[in-house]
Amino acid sequence: MAIERITDNKFELVSKYDPAGDQGQAISELVENIENGEKAQILRGATGTGKTYTMSQVIAQTGKPTLVMAHNKTLAGQLYSEFKEFFPNNAVEYFVSYYDYYQPEAYVPSSDTYIEKDSSVNDEIDKLRHSATSSLLERNDVIVVASVSCIYGLGSPKEYQDSVVSLRPGQEISRDQLLNDLVGIQFERNDIDFQRGCFRVRGDVVEVFPASRDEHAFRVEFFGDEIDRIREIEVLTGQVLGEVDHLAIFPATHFMTNDDRMEESIAKIEAELEAQLKVFRSEGKLLEAQRLEQRTNYDIEMLREMGYCNGVENYSRHMDGREEGEPPYTLLDFFPDDFMIMIDESHMTMGQVKGMYNGDRARKEMLCNYGFRLPSALDNRPLKREEFESHVHQIVYVSATPGDYEMEQTDTIVEQIIRPTGLLDPVVEVRPMMGQIDDLVGEIHKRAEKNERVFVTTLTKKMSEDLTAYFKEMGIKVKYMHSDIKTLERTEIIRDLRLGVFDVLVGINLLREGIDVPEVSLVAILDADKEGFLRNERGLIQTIGRAARNSEGHVILYSDMAKALDENDPADKEILDSGYYTEYEGKKYKITRSMKHAMDETARRRDIQMAYNEEHGITPQTIKKEIRDLIAITKKTDSGELEEVDASAMNKKERKALVKKLEKEMQQAAAALDFEGAAQLRDMVLELRAMD
């Protein structure tokens, strides 16, 4: 039975802050553009300017159901936590891949190796996915924070909605009919272990535990063949929380198919099997034909008997009634037509959207060519980028450095440059590559005397190693951050840098998560004129931003300055006319297009920030950020106060008990989607284990 979506709920933003800096202007521009029907726009916001708050204000003021996409689970979890705080009275949902572990089905012809699909589903995330889809069909005030997994097939929203079991007090329906209806939407009867997606029966009382809940269930009480009343109960204690006048029970799976559709689907699968067997046999692929026939007939038998089979998603084209090549249903189809999409870190996320389809296709083609799957399995896939675009009603790309794709989609760019702390983008200068190491040594000594830190980025592993060795010979306290270093070690290195155990961190890629250090006042980029992934415009801007947390922030780009530009040389004059040059000691030298654009953009932002600070009497202050010792572990005393525990003073048995306790807390934090807290607890556990 279909249900009506409640459309009169409003978003209610709860925050103790008012828009600061240029947030107010950015918010009003974005809202005005949306209300004027602008399809795509970019929020180009510098790091640390409060882009999530701006996004929240835009959602609240436009009132549109919104999909917020991020490029990984960790970032999605952080955004989800922030939006939950901003909108405690609205439906803020979380939709990411529910696999803790996932090994996709694959075949490697070179070694004749078939790898069966193997996975482990996270029950908590599965619950949140069900909560997201049910909220989207029930109400309008919904924000769904999702990873790119939201463009993967999910089942038909119409079948899902039409399968809803709708109950009201006074409704005429027999108890047995309700039980049949619940089984029909994939609920299981379990009178002993009552959990999500189950129901239990006690005389004239049926208790239902929805797939989207984790603590509360519903008790349906019958009087003959009529529902007497419906109560919400706490699962653990059985305590009645209140009565409800309507209960919509959504299916326990997103992949719903009624009996008639199932028979149609099986007939189509059989027809496709017959056609594909003819193709294989005509090509002399008898092994492939036998394999396909055996596997598919087994799946058909399972579908007939159980309504389900292993890898049922590979038959989704037939189950959904789609034509060959048609896009699958995804989370996007559950939204109303006028919904809004916000893409966080769009320069990363849109690249993922583009790449998902091709990677999936290559793996599935191998399975189909060798008789492991029917060709229709190719239509169990993520959306292509063009198909994703066809779902877009209105979209906001959010990034400090928008990608080429976003820039091609729209000319409407809204900027957010002012940081509430008053911090400026750093001063950037270019210096010659000749003598760069000695020059850098001098700069490092200046920073060390002021108790400040330095980042040095190189292009190759060998150069990083050689540079680190040279600095050590010169008496500089230095460490090298390379790709083999694990997360925990990286955290330790950053902590030691902040504490002043060493002054200089050398690395190739210093753009990873968690490497924002307020004590860093100098970033030196060696070989800045060598175009590539970390020396393109976006890479340079992001690396330059590492010095933007310190009021003394300074960046030096070391570049080849072997030959000054000569205005009388036609080739040099062309470079001078293009503007891709810099001045050093009265002479002009060629620089790359990326360097020029990164420097110009940083200078432009800095000028705007300085003017704002001057007008409002703001003095930039370096961010004060607590330095947490990994070994410092706190526990609650009997009085409820926190006290620090010295792990090194514990014996082995005490540490083992503490590890057990922390692991439990880590799992609780992960279940509550506090991924940062869970990661900190994990690091503590690893540290404690390393001590024994």
UniProtKB/Swiss-Prot annotation:
This protein's record includes keyword Transport: no
UniProt motif Beta-hairpin: location: 98-121
Keyword ATP-binding: yes
GO molecular function ontology, one term from the record: ATP binding
Domain Helicase C-terminal residues, every copy: 436-631
Subunit structure: Forms a heterotetramer with UvrA during the search for lesions. Interacts with UvrC in an incision complex.
UniProt protein name: UvrABC system protein B
Name of the gene encoding the protein in the UniProt record: uvrB
